[in-house]
Amino acid sequence: MSKSIIPSTPNEKDYASSQSSDLGWIDSKDPVSLFSNWLSEAIVTEINDANAMSVATVDKNGMPDVRVVLLKDIDHRGFVFYSNSESNKGQQLSFSNKVALGFHWKSKKRQVRVRGTAEVVASIEADAYFASRARGSRISAWASHQSRPVKDRETMMNELNETEARFEGTSVPRPNHWLGWRVKPEYIEFWQDGAYRFHDRLAFSMTSDGWVKGRLYP
């Protein structure tokens, strides 16, 4: 493989032009509020999907798995996303609810890591979010056998068309297999790019007395 595919290592000039002096966030005491602020800033600067996050799970053999999904809600209870419970991630979550999340905002040169446990959100909450989706997306949730093998795209489209016909002229309810999960955070870490790889890291750990924070070496 050609080395030209990999970006060259930054030089002195690159670092000098990219240093950030905005470290006011280091004084934050509430990681959820800090996360919300960072996400709000990223929504302005990212090309798209600033709420995209990596969700890491493990299967029955302890083999890790990771994929990118969209964060759909955030408050002091946790981070919420939705998916098909019959998918690989859904099956893995039913086996082990220990989850790790990762956010990376290239435009801000920031990352956030979250570790915690996932629990299924209440049906009324999942129903409300499902109803807010575009009709086509709701139909797709019924038509897709997520993570299962399929012969070709024609097969997929035929099933989608059949599902559209099935719901023609009627509302599209949430399928029983389409669920939401809330990741209750036990650890949240914030990372801000620094010159010469000397980054700033701030970690929050949940204890019986609430959040405890501390700095980490880069």
Model-predicted regions and their roles:
Residues 1-218:
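Binding-site signature for planar aromatic cofactors or substrates
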